[in-house]
Amino acid sequence: MRRLWTVGCFSRLIARHFSSVARRGERPGGEELSRLLLDDLAPAQRLERLFGLSPCLLALRAARRRVARLLLQAGKAGLQGERAELLRVAEARGIPVLRPRRQKLDALCGYQVHQGVCMEVSPLRPRPCDEAADTSSGDDPQQLWLVLEGLQDPRNLGAVMRSAHFLGVDRVITSQRNSCPLTPVVSKASAGAMEVMDVFATPDLPGFLQAKAQQGWLVVGTVGCPGPEISQSSKVPITSCLEFVWDRPTLLVLGSEGSGLSQEVFASCQLLLTILPRRHLPPGLESLNVSVATGILLHSICSQKKGFPVQERGQLLQDS
């Protein structure tokens, strides 16, 4: 017990020393001290390493994760701008700040593109789907929820979340089964949007869709460029995303990268949207990457959003 107490005190003392000189960009304590801090005092279980400037900064601002320590690459000139803000926020919250060399930080981040920034944090988990209804605005006829079934590529999921946040999607719902968890790779691919969005998960996606349809929501599935055989065999009407009219609360449902929507989810859809190509396509090129398709579909729908103040639009144009 005394040994554990001594190690704990030493760790806190060293962490304070690192934080006090972090502003100056120095590498305190030498290589041996850094190796002790980063290897021997390994992160506690159930922590993960979040990497990248935007994910780490947005995670600190949102304060939804527990942060064990912040790692800033040694030798980064000046710690200005967002890196300086990272340091200020971390020190204000008493978060230890370490300054490893790039080679060490590369290894800690699994050789991902980390931009000289990494944080050891508690994971983010999707919230139960019943909480989505509790926090929604039921009287808004132009609510748009994005529903994802079985997306497994973390970079696709991150890119989808980035587009959803940018274009004003109200909720993101995922299937619990066969879906990518909310990992640091997802957060990096989302440019940190994952850190500020509420993501919900349901164990019964077809049941969820059917329940929302009974509440008056329109369940809209998605399909690749339909050939004549698909158009004739489908019992669900198919329309171009450019012809879709958004006049009631809508669930936009996208399927997995390989197989698309499952039969159960497909059967729950009341309408199918497609993106029509601008040329004849050879076999194998009839569809788009799911994150690209999501951006196009969301933009075509969200451009119909009513009630966006003229003054606010003008301010956004001026700021850009």
Swiss-Prot record:
InterPro entries: Alpha/beta_knot_MTases, MRM1, MRM1_MeTrfase_dom, Ribosomal_eL30-like_sf, SpoU_MeTrfase, SpoU_subst-bd, tRNA_m1G_MTases_N. The keyword Cell membrane does not apply. It comes from Mus musculus (Mouse). Residues 1-17 form a transit peptide. It catalyses: guanosine(1145) in 16S rRNA + S-adenosyl-L-methionine = 2'-O-methylguanosine(1145) in 16S rRNA + S-adenosyl-L-homocysteine + H(+). PANTHER family: RRNA METHYLTRANSFERASE 1, MITOCHONDRIAL. The keyword S-adenosyl-L-methionine applies. Keywords: Methyltransferase, Mitochondrion, rRNA processing, S-adenosyl-L-methionine, Transferase, Transit peptide. It is an enzyme of class 2 (transferase). It comes from the Eukaryota. Its main location: mitochondrion. S-adenosyl-L-methionine-dependent 2'-O-ribose methyltransferase that catalyzes the formation of 2'-O-methylguanosine at position 1145 (Gm1145) in the 16S mitochondrial large subunit ribosomal RNA (mtLSU rRNA), a universally conserved modification in the peptidyl transferase domain of the mtLSU rRNA. This is rRNA methyltransferase 1, mitochondrial. GO terms for cellular component: mitochondrial matrix; mitochondrion. GO terms for molecular function: RNA binding; rRNA (guanosine-2'-O-)-methyltransferase activity.
